[in-house]
């Protein structure tokens, strides 16, 4: 019995010690929470102080700009008295000063409407001249772009390799592909090929891509290029690059040299004007006005079986 009592006492003692330790740990956790909140508050306060300082600086700069503009427009500046507090009996004089300032500003505005000072006229003329120069430059750039012939050289056609293909989550007839076109990151491409090409045949497939169409969303997925195919009302076949092609290889046309547009302007309908002249010939070779799609030093692009068909 004595032994049992001793064991019980030890257990009670250990239990009391455990309670004390738990209470101590609770206090420490509470202190740590308070400390963390305090640190977060201090960080936020510091951040707000920095932002306030920036805002004050911006306000001061804007005030100085406003003062300079008023001076240029002939508005008289009334300095505020320094170190002299305004008392209740000075309200009348304050109102007089304010009304004078308003009158002066409005008179300055009237002068500005009438034509402004000589300096202001010069500044306006300078701005107008700059605007005219900028407009002329933009017109010349647009003119040079429009002066390029509308032919297949405007298209950025490249070899790509489909890394993965999957069905579109919201459209039964569409595939979503990730395609390597020789850039840092693959491009996402949406194609309406579900009814023409089995999914397993899309994986790791070499294709030809039109890469400078403006990216467009297709049922919620942004498509960044278009897979080129031989096409008829009954059938579609993906065009195949020549053996030895690698992602990023350019498609060229001997009779149509030139650099492609960075991005085809949808308003100019350039692709729509070129597409009717894209066909496969009697030997299933892809052509533009009879000139083959070619990868320099590697060969021509072709359809599997579709001859004398459109391409899109």
Swiss-Prot record:
PROSITE patterns found in the cross-reference section: TRBD
Domain tRNA-binding: residue ranges: 151-252
Functional summary from the UniProt entry: Non-catalytic component of the multisynthase complex. Stimulates the catalytic activity of cytoplasmic arginyl-tRNA synthase. Binds tRNA. Possesses inflammatory cytokine activity. Negatively regulates TGF-beta signaling through stabilization of SMURF2 by binding to SMURF2 and inhibiting its SMAD7-mediated degradation. Involved in glucose homeostasis through induction of glucagon secretion at low glucose levels. Promotes dermal fibroblast proliferation and wound repair. Regulates KDELR1-mediated retention of HSP90B1/gp96 in the endoplasmic reticulum.
Residues the record lists as Phosphoserine modifications: 140
Organism: Homo sapiens (Human)
A Pfam family recorded for this sequence: tRNA_bind
Biological process (GO), any one: cell-cell signaling
N-acetylalanine sites (modified residues): 2
Biased composition (Basic and acidic residues): 111-138
Residue ranges, annotated region (Required for endothelial cell death): 101-114
Residue(s) of cross-link: Glycyl lysine isopeptide (Lys-Gly) (interchain with G-Cter in SUMO1): 137
Residues modified as N6-succinyllysine: 269
Gene: AIMP1
Disease field: Leukodystrophy, hypomyelinating, 3: A severe autosomal recessive hypomyelinating leukodystrophy characterized by early infantile onset of global developmental delay, lack of development, lack of speech acquisition, and peripheral spasticity associated with decreased myelination in the central nervous system.
Location of region: Interaction with HSP90B1: 54-194
Keyword set, alphabetical order: Acetylation, Angiogenesis, Apoptosis, Cytokine, Cytoplasm, Endoplasmic reticulum, Golgi apparatus, Inflammatory response, Isopeptide bond, Leukodystrophy, Nucleus, Phosphoprotein, Protein biosynthesis, RNA-binding, Secreted, tRNA-binding, Ubl conjugation
Subunit details: Homodimer. Part of the multisynthetase complex (MSC), a multisubunit complex that groups tRNA ligases for Arg (RARS1), Asp (DARS1), Gln (QARS1), Ile (IARS1), Leu (LARS1), Lys (KARS1), Met (MARS1) the bifunctional ligase for Glu and Pro (EPRS1) and the auxiliary subunits AIMP1/p43, AIMP2/p38 and EEF1E1/p18. Interacts (via N-terminus) with RARS1 (via N-terminus). Part of a complex composed of RARS1, QARS1 and AIMP1. Interacts (via C-terminus) with SMURF2. Interacts (via N-terminus) with HSP90B1/gp96 (via C-terminus). Interacts with PSMA7. Interacts with TARS3.
Residue numbers spanned by region Required for endothelial cell migration: 114-192
Name by which UniProt lists this protein: Aminoacyl tRNA synthase complex-interacting multifunctional protein 1
CDD domains named among the record's database cross-references: tRNA_bind_EMAP-II_like
Location, primary (coarse class): nucleus
Region annotation (Disordered) ranges: 107-147
